[in-house]
Amino acid sequence: AKNAFNAKVGFGQFDTNYGVAKNGPNDKDVIDDKDAFYAKAGYNFGFAKLGADYIKFQNNEVLNDELYGIDLYVPVGDFRVQGEYVKNTTTTEKYDDAWNVGLGYGKADWKKPGTWALDVFYNEIGKGTYFGGTGLGTDMLKNLKAGEQIKFWNVGADVTLQKNVQLHAEYAFGADLEKAADPDDAWTVSLNYKF
């Protein structure tokens, strides 16, 4: 496959208002402006794409975690199967990994009105791998700091309404939060423009 291998590395600041980190509820323990090194590599085999991730937080008494991840994407005609797994190798949390697996159909092409895509994912996320922020459009993960692990389903859809205009919707449901109250179902709808 053309451009089969890709890689990138970086070093930067990690900012979050997710709350307190590992040492307790004191303000001094809030994760803020902390250095992090990351590396990402992937290979497109043609029949599948495989990726690997690494992140290491630096110079921080509160947040010095090290995480490894792997992801796989397999197109099968108009369908796609994908998943990812992340493990925190330095945390003392009982639930130190996260994973998801999903099935999708279709492709919402920004240039072709009427095209659409639908995806469904099952997610299982441990407290030891979540530091705030998400690629989800919903706030399903906001209560994870009160529990230990969350399991839930997520359905997402995109429809191209006209060239460079898409409607996006997500619905997260069936949540089970370990050692805390289960969060309510969550949803979002957005209209997106590409310039």
Identify the meaning behind each predicted range:
Residues 24-29, 42-195:
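Outer-membrane beta-barrel pore domains
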Residues 1-24, 35-41:
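Mobile, glycine-rich extracellular loop/lid and propeptide segments
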Residues 30-34:
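Short capping loops/turns at secondary-structure boundaries
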